[in-house]
Amino acid sequence: MLSLASFAQKASPTDKDKTEVIPTASYLKRGAPIGKSDKVSLNAVFRDPSKFEGKSIVVEGIVVRSCKMEGCWAEVAQDKDSKSVRVKMKDHSFFIPLQSAGSLARVEGTVQVKTLTKAMVDHMIEEDGAKFNNRNADGTVTEVSFEATGIELKRIT
């Protein structure tokens, strides 16, 4: 039996998605509105990711890097010198501007601990400019990541 989900296609970003200017006086909002999930620091998430895995939370930080092809992921850190978490937009259903690096991000979603395949890691490095400091011997990467249901971006002046 086939389900409708098997025919679902991922969304593609529009030119506006890729190029919209991030405001300085308000937030550019993508995905679902940020709700009332508990706000948790990224430092707390990194200290004990299993405590937050699968739970809806809100994190804030600085976008240190983002996807240069579609705007389907960003790396967000507590501050520019801290460890970053990869934020993927849920179900590839919304996108952020390609020039999001340096913006303040407020993100709601769930923490995940997963292993990325070597092929995915290679793609993210070659196509999107991703960086990995902890590559496993077989080329895979085990990482703490964040699946965003909504994101708000504000340009820091």
What are these regions (language model features)?
Residues 1-11:
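Bacterial Sec-dependent N-terminal signal peptides
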